[in-house]
Design a protein with these regions (language model features):
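Conserved N-terminal phosphate-binding loop of PLP-dependent enzymes in the Aspartate aminotransferase
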Residues: 1-391
């Protein structure tokens, strides 16, 4: 049997990882400035993470949600404490798409309505409702096309026009669009959106799958705007590579048996991984570190990268050029051995390093980028010599 290959694969086989570094089967070292799509939050093979998972596996790795699993409540308590959402409830699942699927389903159950307001450029996953709310027709199958979705720009008047129809169960928004190219709605827009949802009786779902867990310098990116969504989707950095997702649910939304369900969600190992992540975020003060390193990275890029725009917050950064970045990205990997990401906009380079990335590792990336950008753009642009990153 062969794999059903849906990804274009680079010819690299990682066999070891530690912190922000990977090694392939030939012994070549790589710098991870992408974290496997924002998944690696506390660094590869963090000792506390490895210990937590090892100890849990030596006791019990899995049993179904038909029995008492105290580590689930331990995780819920810790997540509420660290995130500032202690009064919310937690439903656990396995991925970001599944989290968004359950968020949308919960909103529809709660309101008795079905229409969803989503935003241009959004990505919420590849399952039924989540992909319907994703602004990419190429990945929406005919089977997924019958959902009632209204895509709008970041325009409060346009949002209100849809809400006035009276059939909207929820608005779902990424506080920072990841796949879309690190696009940020303004804090004022998020505040206005929250007010409109409340006015018209629709739930506000914050998709924090990529932007959450300290990535923006706050635990959740929407906290920069001071809003409190009704439902918050989490995954990716939540497990640092172990499959886990979830939704944080406002106390006004009540649970009933059978409303949502999962076989593997919230298993013992997944909860151990998620607890380890929260413990390391706290113990190593990674929110402050992400803020500090993010500020340093963006200020250096703004001064020296020759870009049209530097986007993002914390360690969720987009670099927009006036030319396609494919060649730069390919050479960062093949010549400088640095993993970075791309976006749906071919001119945007996406950076999502571990939250504990060091200044020396940031400088290594910057020097490689400046060299390649100078070469890539020299035929079309006059450029001054780049400045070395500040030490």
């Amino acid at each position: 049997m062969e794999l059903f290959n849906v990804y274009p694969l680079v010819n690299i086989t990682p066999v070891k990882a530690l912190g922000a570094k990977l090694w392939d089967d030939k012994g070549q070292e790589y710098l991870d400035f992408y974290g496997g799509h924002a998944v690696i939050s506390i660094g590869h093979s963090h000792p506390h993470y490895v210990q937590r998972l090892t100890e849990q596996l030596q006791n019990i790795g899995f049993y179904s949600n038909s029995v008492q699993i105290p580590i689930q409540q331990e995780l819920a308590h810790k997540l509420g404490q660290v995130s500032g959402y202690e009064e919310y409830s937690l439903f656990l699942c396995n991925s970001g798409a599944e989290a968004n699927e359950n968020a949308l389903k919960l909103a529809s159950f709660h309101t008795g309505k079905k229409r969803v307001v989503a935003f241009k450029g959004a990505f919420h996953g590849r399952t039924s409702g989540a992909v319907a709310a994703t602004d990419n027709p190429k990945i929406v199958a005919p089977f997924n096309a019958d959902h009632a979705i209204s895509f709008v720009e970041y325009d409060l008047a346009a949002v209100e026009q849809v809400l006035q129809g009276g059939d909207v169960c929820a608005a779902i928004i990424e506080p920072i669009q990841g796949v879309g190219g690190i696009i940020m709605p303004s804090d004022e827009f998020l505040t206005g959106l929250a007010a409109l949802c409340k006015q018209y009786g629709a739930l506000l779902i914050a998709d924090e799958v990529q932007s959450g867990y300290g990535r923006s310098g706050k635990f959740f990116a929407h906290q920069h705007a001071g809003i409190r969504p009704d439902v918050i989707s989490v995954a990716k950095g939540m497990g640092n590579g172990f499959p886990i997702g979830g939704i944080l649910i406002a106390p006004e939304l009540k649970a009933s048996y059978g409303l949502l369900g999962t076989t593997f969600g919230g298993n013992h190992l997944a909860c151990a991984a998620a607890l380890a992540v929260l413990e390391v975020i706290e113990q190593e003060n990674l929110l402050a570190h992400a803020t500090e390193m993010g500020h340093y990275l963006r200020s250096e890029l703004e001064a020296n990268a020759g870009a049209e725009e530097i986007r993002g917050r914390g360690l969720m950064v987009g670099i927009k050029y006036d030319f396609p970045i494919k060649d730069v990205r390919d050479k960062l990997l093949s010549e400088h051995h640095i993993f970075v990401g791309n976006a749906s906009d071919p001119t945007v380079l996406r950076l999502l390093p571990p939250l504990n990335i060091s200044k020396a590792e940031v400088d290594r990336f910057l020097q490689a980028l400046y060299t390649l950008v100078a070469l890539s753009s020299s035929s079309a642009h006059e450029r001054s010599e780049y400045v070395e990153p500040h030490r």
